[in-house]
Amino acid sequence: MSILKKTALAAATAAVFASAPALAYEAGDMMLRVGAAGVYPTSDSEEITAIAPGAKVEADDAWSLGITFSYMFTDNIGLGVLGAYPFEHDIDAKGSISSLGTVGKVKHLPPTVTLQYYFNNSTNFTPFLGAGVNYTYFFDEDTQGALSGANLDVDDSWGYAFEGGVDYNINDQWMVSGQVYYINIETEASVSAIPGKFDVDINPWVYFLSAGYKF
């Protein structure tokens, strides 16, 4: 190959790379993702002996609109915030009282902040991991069925959180994303018809599928 052809090929290659979008994240980048978030509890309450031996309650699964925001401090390290429209869970009787069915409802907001590490590479896929803290705010507690008319109160909680995810960068700005969180949510609840409080462990897996935009 002649020197002229080699030079022309090198120039063409450089032009292609110069015009290709820079898909890797950089310090100062901000990513906003919006999509569907699902909360899947993995635990239930302690035994509520004041009701009956073996009596327990459990929150069911719930989906809502989710949103995350990430800010990159460096090309690899960022800070992520998870928010959502309130999740609403049915509270189901379990154990020896499972025949009672749904005995209440509760809503919650789970704002979560994580320190994230992004594995930048030369592909359109950018995987990342994160760890941080969660605060869960419970509200609009209500009873129904066998507990109808009783007052239900669920305490807010603090806990740790882990996440893993991957962004597929369609171009330099738009992406689709999938994330999975494990969130430590351990709280206490009380019902006016039952003496004392009882522990409720929710500890959910949270699944988030979204579309995002990089600023």
Q: For each of these PLM feature ranges, what is it?
A:
Residues 1-28:
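Cleavable N-terminal export/targeting peptides
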Residues 2-12, 61-71, 77, 85:
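Domain-scale selection of a single, long terminal region
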Residues 22-69, 206:
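Short glycine/proline- and aromatic-enriched beta-strand/turn motifs that initiate or cap beta-hairpins
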Residues 27-29, 42, 68-144, 204-215:
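Gram-negative (and chloroplast) outer-membrane scaffold detector with strong preference
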Residues 44-51, 90-99, 139-150, 188-196:
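Outer-membrane beta-barrel translocator domains and adjoining extracellular loop/strand segments
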Residues 88-92, 171-215:
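Predominantly the C-terminal beta-signal and adjacent terminal strand-loop region
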Residues 111-113, 129-135, 156-166, 180:
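Hydrophobic alpha-helical segments of small multi-pass membrane proteins
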